[in-house]
Each structure stands twice: as C-alpha cells, then as structure tokens.
Regions:
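HKD-type phospholipase D/PLD-like phosphodiesterase module
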Residues: 1, 5, 12-142
Length: 145
C-alpha cells in the first residue's frame, strides 16, 4: 500500500468498471495523504473530462494530459488543424509506488485488459520491478507531463 506517492501513466484509460475502480483507488490513496500524479495521453480520455477535473481538484492529486487537445468536445477538429498531433503519442504504461516499486508493461486500463468485461481479453504483459529502473520510470513521468 502506498504511503508517500503514486506515479501513474497510461496511454488508454477506459471509462468502464476497471477504469472507475482504479480512479477510486487513486482517490482513496490521496485521501490518506499519498501524493498522486496521473499522466494520460489525451488522445484516449474521451468522456473522462469531468472525472479528471474532479480528481485534479483534490489537493493531493495532479492530473496531466500529454499532448492535450485545444477543443475538448471536438477532438477531430484538433486533428484537422494540427495533423502532427496524430502521431505524437505517449504510450507509457506504469504504476509506481513510493518510488520503490513499479509495474511496467503493455497493458492499459480497461476491462478488456483485465478480463473484466464481455470484450475479448487483450494479451499484454506487465512486469513488476524494483531498483534503479524505478527511478528511470519516475523520470519519464516528469519529462512527459
């Protein structure tokens, strides 16, 4: 259980049971006094603006969007006016606890990644790491935010 910090970064975060459950875990940790930093690629946050704003309003939670869209409700317009944005993505997927342990892999956050829904299960792998690699992962959170 996190005592000091959670650094969380994902490419896709679905608004489904798994996504909402993990949001509630982050909120519970922040309410215990844990500093939470959440970094998401804005390309995959459709429908999450309200919950992300609520989370960001918590004094212990910082929400950052990588490559944020100027037009929140008309994202397609953002692609038309700035085509370079299409390939400028942040594919990081990690969950780091207290700067001591991290889970890094190919799995995003959503029912299809955890076998929790009716959708087919994506076959992705994650690894848990401790040691110097954790500091490198935390650095990437800072660089991309």
């Amino acid at each position: 259980m996190a005592e000091r910090s959670l650094d969380v970064q994902y490419y896709i975060w679905e608004d489904d049971m798994s996504g909402r459950l993990l949001f509630s875990v982050l909120l519970a940790a922040a309410s215990r006094g844990v500093r939470v930093r959440l970094l998401l690629d804005d390309n995959n946050t459709q429908g999450l603006d309200e919950i992300l704003s609520l989370l960001d309003a918590h004094p212990n939670i910082s929400v950052r969007l990588f490559n944020p869209f100027s037009f929140r409700s008309l994202r397609a317009l953002g692609y038309l006016t700035d085509f370079a944005r299409l390939n400028r993505r942040m594919h990081n997927k990690s969950f780091t606890v207290d700067g001591e342990a991290t889970i890094i892999g190919g799995r995003n956050v959503g029912d299809a990644y955890f076998g929790a829904g009716e959708e087919p299960l994506f076959s992705d792998l994650d690894v848990m790491a401790v040691g110097p690699v954790v500091k490198e992962d935390r650095k990437s959170t800072r660089l991309n935010s």
